[in-house]
Amino acid sequence: EDKRIQEICFGAYEGMCIGGEKMDPKSGEFNKFFVDTENYVPIDGGETVPQLMKRTGEFLRELCENKELSQKNVLVTTHGAAMTALLNNIKENFDVAAFWKNGVPANCAVTIVDVKEGKPEIIKENVIYYKEQVRTWKVGK
């Protein structure tokens, strides 16, 4: 386990109901994380998107530069925002406003990355290996 690839910390927003009858009145501010990411301001110990990008980027850099792993297959698993941050780091998309540009990887989706000379390259992205229909989770305004 590596804490650098844990899901983003939402602070006081953790567990907040953001829809339906029990929707929290403060959920509008929290919803900016999904629809207006550059204006999302975390509260009470929450983490910013740049902080998430930095820690996942450090993990990725260390992984790619580890010579002991150069001829090995490595499995990395995490949650949606952290995985999106990892993919954005690989694609060098550091624009917070475009954080969700490619959506959220589907549940259990597989992305294959090849590392050559310390540089990661996406070979296949968001491949699904199960047959059951799963609702796509989209982020957008």
Name each region found by the language model.
Residues A85-N89:
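Active-site signature of alpha/beta-hydrolase-fold catalytic machinery across serine-
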Residues N93-E121:
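Domain-level recognition of soluble alpha/beta enzyme cores
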Residues E29-Q51:
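Short glycine/proline- and acidic residue-enriched helix-loop micro-motifs
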Residues E1-R4, K32-V35, I112-K141:
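Conserved histidine-centered catalytic loops in small-molecule metabolism enzymes
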Residues E1-N31:
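Phosphate-coordination/substrate-recognition cap region in phosphate-metabolizing enzymes
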Residues L63-K72:
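Glycine-rich phosphate-binding loop signature in dinucleotide/nucleotide-binding domains
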Residues E7-I8, A82-T84:
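Short, active-site-adjacent cap segments at secondary-structure transitions
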Residues H79:
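Short, conserved phosphate/pyrophosphate- and ester-handling motifs at nucleotide-, phospho-/glycolipid
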